[in-house]
UniProtKB/Swiss-Prot annotation:
The modification Phosphothreonine is found at T98. Induction: Expressed late during infection in a Rev-dependent manner. This is Virion infectivity factor. GO terms for biological process: viral life cycle. It is found in: Host cytoplasm; Host cell membrane; Virion. A motif (BC-box-like motif) lies at residues 147-156. Keywords: Host cell membrane, Host cytoplasm, Host membrane, Host-virus interaction, Membrane, Phosphoprotein, Ubl conjugation, Ubl conjugation pathway, Virion. GO terms for cellular component: host cell cytoplasm; host cell plasma membrane; membrane; virion component. The gene is vif. Homomultimer; in vitro and presumably in vivo. Interacts with viral Pr55Gag precursor and host APOBEC3G. The interaction between Vif and APOBEC3G is species-specific, which may play a role in restricting the replication of SIV to their host. Forms an E3 ligase complex by interacting with host CUL5 and elongin BC complex (ELOB and ELOC). Residues 170-190 have a biased composition (Basic residues). It is a peripheral membrane protein.
């Protein structure tokens, strides 16, 4: 008697491209800029028995929780083989775990990683002084109800980016540079180049980097 196939069903996000772009950006932010120094990158040959997993990236968060992004390959649908890759994004606490959307994962990441406006920037903005910090992960605020302080600082930084101060223009360009840097570094890895990627790139968000929801 032929044994029936057992299926393991988990929610995943299909991605249109391979995961080199994601791996490249994670390694750059972990080893070069140190923005993700606490993150743990596990390549496919260290995953172990889970042969369908091509990588795991674990982000320790506050209060003994962590976020995990698993990349899948060789997935089998009902017919044929899945030609594209997929990722699963899961949040874990001590006694509970749940799958989360890319947007909410960005919010969780920003609670621990990537600097935002400092507490004293609101007072500086009111006094008309030069702001010395900026949010390096603006995508994480996309689905949140922004505070009045965050809105005010965003407006101030936007106005100054249109003026004479080139620093704020650079902050805005950095939001786009993150994804571009990941693409370029991925190509360099394929070509065997040892040239280091550009520094100062902001994190563009999980959905943007992985290409999901495109």
């Amino acid at each position: 008697m032929e044994e029936e196939k057992n299926w393991i069903v988990v929610p995943t996000w299909r991605i249109p491209e391979r995961l080199e772009r994601w791996h490249s950006l994670i390694k750059h932010l972990k080893y070069n800029t140190k923005d993700l120094q606490m993150a743990c990158y596990v390549p496919h040959h260290k995953v172990g028995w889970a042969w369908w997993t091509c990588s795991r990236v674990i982000f320790p968060l506050r209060d003994e929780t962590h976020l995990e992004v698993q990349g899948y390959w060789n997935l089998a649908p009902e017919k044929g083989w899945l030609s594209t890759y997929a990722v699963r994004i899961t949040w874990y606490s001590r006694n509970f775990w749940t799958d989360v959307t890319p947007d909410y994962a960005d919010t969780l990441l920003h609670s621990t990683y990537f600097p935002c406006f400092s507490e004293g920037e609101v007072r500086k903005a009111i006094r008309g002084e030069k702001l010395l910090s900026c949010c390096k992960f603006p995508k994480a605020h996309k689905n949140q109800v922004p505070s009045l302080q965050y809105l005010a600082l965003t407006v101030v930084s936007h106005v100054r980016s249109q003026g004479e101060d080139p620093t704020w223009k650079q902050w805005r360009r950095n939001n786009r540079k993150g994804l571009r840097m990941a693409k370029q570094n991925s190509r360099r890895n394929k070509q065997g180049s040892s040239k280091s990627p550009a520094e100062g790139a902001n994190f563009p968000g999980l959905a943007k980097v992985l290409g999901i929801l495109a």
